[in-house]
Amino acid sequence: MKVISVAGDRVAILLEGADTNQQYTVMEALLPPGGGPPPHLHHREDETFLVLAGEVTFYVGDTVTVLKKGGFIFAPREIPHHFRNTGTGEAMLLETAFPAGVETFFAAAGKPLPDRNAQPLEFTREDIANMIAIAPRFGIEILTKEKN
């Protein structure tokens, strides 16, 4: 299992494309308070998110949805989206992307962590610039104007 700090969050790759004949990827994401990725869209993958703990606000297109434990949401490809931990403690998500491939972007954009107990690293300006620069190779656009 690969564990990566990406966008200030900790992502554990539970199943990667090599495990699923490239059909899907399953990841566990730990978001500190205020954590979550910048607004972006995928040209290749659809995503689902199941909130395992905490409170997360999802922005999918023009729709804003606040979810707590057990909440589930779909983020289709080609639709801008992002999410924020809007609770007071850590939030945990189970994320599925299909087809597989987004995990290779996370590995390229993030930094390896030793295990699932490690805390995510700070998301620096250099990390943001790198993420924006490499995202197109993976069919992803990082949207620089954040509404929320």
Predicted regions and their residues:
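Short acidic (Asp/Glu) patches
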Residues: R10-V11, G34, P76-I79
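Structural motif
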Residues: R10, T48, E55-T57, V64, ...
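Short, conserved beta-strand element in jelly-roll/cupin
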Residues: V26-P32, L41-V60, T96-P99
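A contiguous, mid-protein "functional segment" used to position or interact
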Residues: G89-A133
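A short, N-terminal "cap"/entry segment at the start of jelly-roll beta-barrel domains
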Residues: M1-Y24, A118-N148
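Short histidine-centered beta-strand/loop micro-motifs
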Residues: L15-E16, P38-H43, R84-T86
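Ligand-binding loop in jelly-roll beta-barrel domains
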Residues: T20, T57, R77-E103
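Short acidic-glycine-tyrosine-enriched beta hairpin
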Residues: D62-P80
